[in-house]
Amino acid sequence: HLLKLPESRFPVSEILDLLDVPALRARFAIQERDLPTLHRWIEGAGIRWGLDAEQRASLGLPVALEQNSWRFGLRRMLLGYAVGTGDGYAGIEPYDEIGGLDAALIGPVVALIDALEVACQQLAKPAVPKVWGERLHDLLQVFFLASNEHDDYLLVQLEELRETWLQTCESVGLEAELPLTVVREAWLAGLDQGRLTQRFLAGSVNF
């Protein structure tokens, strides 16, 4: 999923798939026991797909279409936490089911969506191999924190493949700007897909 962000409509199902990855949850301080609560909030706040109106517009949809996007839903959550069952603000109705200790979950979810937005914008731009190497390194650092030996194995493998690809590009003198599709295929080509599936729950590090 992460290496297809520029093409993504950001449906709820994709974000929930990411949240099924232990290494991603660890990076954003989200516990497995938090997932049912997050599922309930996402559904209750009316989130369906799309980061925001601007991201939807990039897919050729009307510019002002913000409703049922992630930003729309998160604003409902934050407003509901702030005012409870109070009146709406700026056309947004508060989602008032958030309170108590669970409210601390809002921050990590906002941080995840913010990180996905930044990554989406960066990955959409063609770049020379050196810049791609930095982007891929940042992607691993921003989204994943190994919480066990299995996670650590795959993240190390991905980092080694990144370095090998960069060395190959340098050895052949490749300095042209490359699109994401080319980089994605080159980086992941060396992964042992069988081990990847075995070592990460639910398909896990979803590149």
Would you name each region that the model predicts?
Residues 1-207:
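Polyanion-engaging groove/track-forming segments
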